[in-house]
């Protein structure tokens, strides 16, 4: 399991794609990994300030949103099928959006 891989997980509202955003060392060997939830619905609007648009290049079947305003810690055993890996440019967008959404850019 590696940072920036896309898996399926059920966080309590049905199976959705999720992105591992843990430090690579944590993603590789710790019991808990940090993830961002992604929409399972096809994106049919522009992304909100807390979202990044992802698509087939990231292992998804259609364009969808990665929600960057809430980081979840879940047991790695809760992650299901691997869907793909987030592209480098999209990783940069996600990191910028997480920082801005949490207000860390003003520190």
What do the PLM-derived regions correspond to, one by one?
Residues 10, 14-54:
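Compact nucleic-acid interaction/catalytic patches
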Residues 57-107:
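C-terminal terminal-subdomain/extension
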């Amino acid at each position: 399991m590696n940072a920036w891989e896309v898996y399926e997980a059920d966080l309590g509202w049905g199976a959705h794609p999720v992105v591992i955003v843990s430090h690579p060392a944590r993603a590789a060997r710790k019991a808990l990994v940090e993830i961002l939830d992604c929409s399972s619905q096809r994106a049919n609007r522009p992304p909100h300030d807390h979202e990044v648009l992802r698509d087939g290049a990231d292992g998804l079947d259609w364009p969808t949103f990665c929600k960057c305003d809430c980081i979840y810690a879940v047991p790695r055993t809760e992650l299901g099928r691997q869907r793909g890996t987030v592209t480098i440019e999209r990783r940069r967008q996600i990191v910028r959006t997480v920082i801005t959404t949490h207000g860390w850019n003003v520190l």
